[in-house]
C-alpha cells in the first residue's frame, strides 16, 4: 500500500486471466472491490481454469481477500495454476462461491455491511433466464448467509450497490429512459 498525501495506492495482481495481453475475451468480469479489516476484497466471475479449456467453462463467482501490506491472500481457498500473458502464474486463496454446471455468473457486486461483513450479489444466467442471488460472508470469508434467491431482477454492471441500515440499493434501466431503484432488505448479522 503506497501513500501519497490524501490518496492511497495499492498495486497487486492477485487474480490472473488466461490469455495474452490485449486479448478481449477473458471469460471473466470484476464485480467490485471493497475494504474490510482483514484486507482488500475482490469479487468477480471467471472460468475456473487458466488454460485453453477456459473458453468452454461457465463463469463461476469468486472472492479473494488480499492483504494490502503483504499482497498475500488471507483466505485458505483453492489454488489454481496456469498461463497468463505468456507467463506461468499461480493464484492462491481463490474461494469459489458457485459451481454451476448449467449456468454462468454474468454480473456480480460487493458491499460492506455492519461488523465488516461482506455482501455479495450476482446474476445467474441459464436456459431458464436470469435470476439474481445474494450471500453474506464474514471478513474472514466464512459464509454467514448461503446463496439466497432474489428473483428475476437484474444488477447494474456499471454501478456499485449501496448498503445502509440492513438494506441494499441499486438502480437499473429498461432501455426506455426509465430508471428503477431496487431496495432489498438483507437484515443485520451477528
Question: Where are each of the predicted segments found?
Answer:
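Extracellular, repeat-based ectodomains that mediate carbohydrate processing or recognition
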Residues: 1-190
Amino acid at each position: 500500500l503506497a501513500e501519497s498525501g490524501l490518496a492511497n495506492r495499492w498495486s497487486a495482481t492477485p487474480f490472473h486471466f488466461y490469455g495474452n495481453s490485449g486479448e478481449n475475451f477473458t471469460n471473466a468480469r470484476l464485480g467490485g472491490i471493497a475494504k474490510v479489516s482483514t484486507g482488500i476484497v475482490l469479487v468477480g466471475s471467471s472460468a475456473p481454469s487458466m488454460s485453453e479449456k477456459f473458453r468452454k467453462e461457465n463463469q463461476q463467482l469468486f472472492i479473494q481477500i488480499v492483504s494490502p501490506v503483504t499482497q498475500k491472500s488471507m483466505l485458505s481457498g483453492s489454488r489454481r495454476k496456469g498461463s497468463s500473458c505468456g507467463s506461468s502464474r499461480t493464484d492462491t486463496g481463490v474461494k469459489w462461491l458457485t459451481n454451476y454446471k448449467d449456468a454462468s455468473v454474468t454480473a456480480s457486486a460487493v458491499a460492506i455491511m455492519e461488523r465488516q461483513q461482506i455482501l455479495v450479489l450476482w446474476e445467474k444466467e441459464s436456459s431458464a433466464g436470469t435470476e439474481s442471488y445474494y450471500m453474506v460472508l464474514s471478513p474472514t470469508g466464512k459464509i454467514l448467509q448461503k446463496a439466497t434467491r432474489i428473483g428475476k431482477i437484474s444488477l447494474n454492471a456499471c454501478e456499485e450497490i449501496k448498503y445502509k441500515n440492513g438494506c441494499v440499493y441499486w438502480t437499473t434501466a429498461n432501455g426506455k429512459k426509465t430508471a428503477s431503484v431496487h431496495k432489498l432488505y438483507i437484515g443485520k448479522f451477528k
